[in-house]
Amino acid sequence: MAQMMTLSLLSLVLALCIPWTQGSDGGGQDCCLKYSQKKIPYSIVRGYRKQEPSLGCPIPAILFLPRKHSKPELCANPEEGWVQNLMRRLDQPPAPGKQSPGCRKNRGTSKSGKKGKGSKGCKRTEQTQPSRG
């Protein structure tokens, strides 16, 4: 009888601890609490991440990452058509020969007359494959 009581008490303690550990990844998770009322333009975002209620946040949301790292993430409703279009556009790789949005193309020379090194934030879009011989 005492063994059954101990087992029941242990089960109760474990059941109470589970909600505290779920959704915890060792750090505080920022959750979006409400959606933006305005459409977010493509030109100000560099990417996005998804927020799921199953991870402890109150609402499902898409959090758009602003180009300026000092700005807060922008929350949007994943069911809105413009949000899905913006996500698709961000998922597309840049066209060959085009720079990613917000990347300034090296114009050849700087004001001092020396060749510039280009922007460190720009990614190369073309990659060459080594030939097999």
UniProtKB/Swiss-Prot annotation:
GO cellular component: external side of plasma membrane; extracellular space
Pfam families: IL8
Biased composition (Basic residues): 104-122
GO molecular function: chemokine activity
Cystine connections: C31-C57, C32-C75, C103-C122
Listed InterPro entries: Chemokine_b/g/d, Chemokine_IL8-like_dom, Interleukin_8-like_sf
Primary localization: secreted
Purpose of the protein: Inhibits hemopoiesis and stimulates chemotaxis. Chemotactic in vitro for thymocytes and activated T-cells, but not for B-cells, macrophages, or neutrophils. Potent mesangial cell chemoattractant. Shows preferential activity towards naive T-cells. May play a role in mediating homing of lymphocytes to secondary lymphoid organs.
Name this polypeptide is given: C-C motif chemokine 21b
Native species: Mus musculus
Native organism taxonomy: Eukaryota, Metazoa, Chordata, Craniata, Vertebrata
Gene: Ccl21b
